[in-house]
């Protein structure tokens, strides 16, 4: 009986973790810098991003839409088909059940801050480059787009690098596929 190959998501997650955990120094640097880059999101009372108050208000309306105490349904209509922030809003809305709207926002932004360097490390590893160079992605977490509050835009950066690395892995697997003549 022929065994099936592991799913692409499992291979992706295993390869991402393998790119980091092989080198203890690299793992320590990633862990320390991830803490350092996430810490500013949690120490202040307010995040210094331009559009965050409007995003928090929108997430708050979505989260308390059916709550009679707020009566948002009388004044607002939630239309999820006309926003480019859908992943951000829905994720924060789900997280808000456990941690509140503001902390859900902090969790989402922290996730971006950790995923960006990890995705760069995955991409560099897939292309056979020095994974240590991914540490240079940490200063890039704090960019103009983040401070303007374009959360959906900056959250796409990790997907870009994960996608480039995944594309390289898939191209390599096609080249080495059994029965493929080169």
How would you describe each model-predicted region?
Residues 107-126:
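Transmembrane-helix motifs of polytopic, lipid-linked glycan transferases
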Residues 128, 163-181:
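Membrane-interface transmembrane helices that cradle and orient dolichyl/undecaprenyl
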Residues 57-64, 76-101:
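Short hydrophobic/aromatic helix or loop-helix immediately within or flanking a transmembrane segment
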Residues 39-71:
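Extracytoplasmic loop-helix module adjacent to an early transmembrane segment
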Residues 1-38:
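Start-transfer (signal-anchor) and selected internal transmembrane alpha helices
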Residues 25, 100-108, 130-133:
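Membrane-interface starts of transmembrane alpha-helices
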Residues 148-156:
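Short acidic/glycine- and proline-prone juxtamembrane loop motifs at membrane-interface regions
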Residues 120-142:
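Transmembrane-helix signature of polytopic, membrane-embedded enzymes
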